[in-house]
Curated annotation (Swiss-Prot):
One Gene Ontology CC term in the entry: host cell nucleus
Note: Average number present in a viral particle is estimated to be 130-200 molecules.
InterPro entries: Flu_NS2
Function, as annotated: Mediates the nuclear export of encapsidated genomic RNAs (ribonucleoproteins, RNPs). Acts as an adapter between viral RNPs complexes and the nuclear export machinery of the cell. Possesses no intrinsic RNA-binding activity, but includes a C-terminal M1-binding domain. This domain is believed to allow recognition of RNPs bound to the protein M1.
GO BP terms: exit of virus from host cell nucleus through nuclear pore
Descriptive protein name: Nuclear export protein
Chief place where the protein resides: virion
Assembly and binders: Interacts with protein M1. May interact with host nucleoporin RAB/HRB and exportin XPO1/CRM1.
Family annotation (SUPFAM superfamilies): Nonstructural protein ns2, Nep, M1-binding domain
Chain location of the short sequence motif Nuclear export signal per the record: 12-21, 85-94
Subcellular localization: Virion; Host nucleus
Organism the protein comes from: Influenza A virus (strain A/Anas acuta/Primorje/695/1976 H2N3)
Protein family (similarity comment): Belongs to the influenza viruses NEP family.
Length: 121
């Protein structure tokens, strides 16, 4: 995985964890958890692509990996919509920058997961 992407994930997760969004802190914690989950999933797909011989191992280990892939794309779409919504409602520039960078990172991760999955199909 690209070291810039790793630091981007870490930076955004750290900044999101420091935000105080009042009653929506549970939503924010959920977003942070999903971000971490997507990072791990993207990393595992990338590793499987690097070891193309692992495709059969991946499929036998997780017969439902296409279903899982579909679920991850749904999570990404939800997070993208949530980031867009947060960008519209927040007036705090720190939060705007964080959500904008998170949105950009989500779009990059979505593209990477698509690329990895096409290589595995």
């Amino acid at each position: 995985m690209d070291s810039n992407t790793v630091s981007s994930f870490q930076d955004i997760l750290m900044r999101m964890s420091k935000m105080q969004l009042g009653s929506s802190s549970e939503d924010l914690n959920g977003m942070i958890t999903q971000f971490e989950s997507l990072k791990l999933y993207r990393d595992s797909l990338g590793e499987a692509v690097m070891r193309m011989g692992d495709l059969h191992s991946l499929q036998s280990r997780n017969g439902k990996w296409r279903e899982q892939l579909s679920q991850k794309f749904e999570e990404i779409r939800w997070l993208i919509e949530e980031m867009r919504h947060r960008l519209k409602i927040t007036e705090n520039s720190f939060e705007q920058i964080t959500f904008m960078q998170a949105l950009q990172l989500l779009l990059e991760v979505e593209q990477e997961i698509r690329t990895f999955s096409f290589q595995l199909i």
